[in-house]
Amino acid sequence: MEVTLSQGEYRLLKLMAERGFREGTLEEASKILGVDKSSLASLSNLLAEKGVVEVEERVEEHYVLTERGRDALERGLPEEKLVLFLAGRGGEASVEEVRRALGEEAGIALGQAARKGLVVIAGGVVRLAVDQAEALKTITPLKKLLENVASGSKPTVGDELLREALSRGLIRREARRSIVLRLKVNPAEALARARVEAAVLTRDMLKSGEWRRLRFKPYNVKAEPPRVLPARRHFLAEFIERLRDILRELGFREVRGPLVELELFNFDVLFQAQDHPAREIHDSLWIKSPRRGDLSGYSDLVERVASVHERGWKYRWSPEVASRYILRSQTTAVSARILATRPNPPARFFTVGKVFRSDAVGPTRLPEFHQLDGIEGDEGYTFRDLLGRLDEIASMLGLKLKFKPAYFPFTEPSVEGYVKLPNGRWLELFGAGMFRPEVLEAVGVDYPVGAWGFGIERLAMAFYGVSDIRKLYTRNVDEVREMRVRWL
């Protein structure tokens, strides 16, 4: 029967014929033929498909020493140590002395020695029941078994000693897989009838004219090339970076702030009353230790904030409340810190970072998520300028935007921004407005400032067509690789 072989298959079959190989494991064949195991396995499977070679996978059970077994072989079995200890003490010792001498192994040693009739335990005293030589002779077979396992010898299955060694965790079973190659044809005859098929046309073939005598393997020019899967950033990180790029292009400078924040910047500077419900423990996450920070470095700011609160909210403002540490609940705290430095106009800043709320994990909410906050201010800056800027940002994201009047504690006038989804629904995305005079007075800024902020995950869910916010944090490599923007 004629068989078509590749050049690699032909060379392997020729090696088998020349070196007399008929049957053996993959490792043995690799040594005999001088072919690396990876290439040998690949070519053997191809020859098996053509009925030339049989490839058999064998699974054999082996026994190996555990760490406890190696320790017993090197330092002695627990019962062996007990026998030697008692022999050195005249044949007996108290149970307490044995425990001190053998430590954690005392219980195993006493149990095994008593079971094998090597010791007698009575009245808190342990005595040798046989002489030292007889006791060690009883223990020797088990040690011999461990030595055989260590050397690679296969113990007799069903042996009582084998069961004991397994139950005591001295040895363990291991399944070892091996591949056996077996020729199904006479290699010399197969070579004589073989038709060699070349896969590559080389320069030497053209030069020598050998190509005229060869049969070439046909190529499927419509076959798809192998899919290349290069590394990529997590899609949520890519989305956040896109938002950063847009704001940088518009002339905004990114700023950062601490995750553990003073209530002074998270609430008080923003004219949020100290008895506001958002400050309660069911909404904010307070720090246990240290509970409070030092406000001495913000004396001027504290004085202005106190004056604004006491005049506006009609209560006695407490620096103790303002000095409490919390996990920041809004990135507007970073904007407050920046404004407190009294930047010269025009001021254009944004921040992207994590905020924390006392929320349960669910399909639409997380206790930890990202917010983007932006501020822009200048002499003569107006609410209309703010809306125009927001519309510009939305258009750069490919979004259609509309506004509705709204209320926020630290901006007036204020709006909510809605973007149109592909299904025609409008999604509430952000809040925006002009900082109230009380906020600007507290930070010492004398020009108008507009502000906006939104949850990044909320927008990302719409962009990627994700209905469960937890999917944005998937670590499944396939999901990360396949995630694509569904909106644009």
From Swiss-Prot:
Its EC number is 6.1.1.20. The keyword Aminoacyl-tRNA synthetase applies. It comes from the Archaea. Binds 2 magnesium ions per tetramer. Mg(2+) binds at E412. It holds the Pfam family tRNA-synt_2d. Its cofactor is Mg(2+). Keywords: Aminoacyl-tRNA synthetase, ATP-binding, Cytoplasm, Ligase, Magnesium, Metal-binding, Nucleotide-binding, Protein biosynthesis. One of its GO terms (molecular function) is tRNA binding. L-phenylalanine binds at T332, Q371, L372, D373, F410, F435. It is an enzyme of class 6 (ligase). GO terms for biological process: phenylalanyl-tRNA aminoacylation. One of its GO terms (cellular component) is cytoplasm. Belongs to the class-II aminoacyl-tRNA synthetase family. Phe-tRNA synthetase alpha subunit type 2 subfamily. Tetramer of two alpha and two beta subunits. NCBIfam families: pheS (TIGR00468), PRK04172.1 (NF003210). This is Phenylalanine--tRNA ligase alpha subunit. It comes from Aeropyrum pernix (strain ATCC 700893 / DSM 11879 / JCM 9820 / NBRC 100138 / K1).
